[in-house]
Amino acid sequence: MKKAYETAMINHGGRNGEVEAPNGSMHMKITPPGIHAEGTNPEQLFAAGYASCFNGAVQHMIKTAESTVKARVSLYNLDDGGYQIGVVLEVHIDGISEEEAQKIAEDAHEFCPYSKATRGNIDVEVTIV
């Protein structure tokens, strides 16, 4: 396997802190989920990354049509006191049938690096909207 790209982010303070790119291109305040404070949280950042990556995979499959992907990331309480995330990817592709869109979404799910990374680790549902 040949590395195509690498990036890094640095966090200070965990879920009540900040995250920044070492090159200074990004800096954000981090807050726990459900807190109505200025900032974002790890679940929102994961949703942003997954939606962008998955839509990139969809675009790779369709080439010409417009598409949108909404990633809904949920945080679940586990019986052991821990947490688990789950994802629903809502895919819309302009100008094609639901059956065609479903096939493209399935192919994108096999191609997307986020889907590959999460496969077998968390529940991911792909739906056509």
Ranges and model annotations:
Residues 1-48, 55-129:
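Extended beta-strand/beta-hairpin segments
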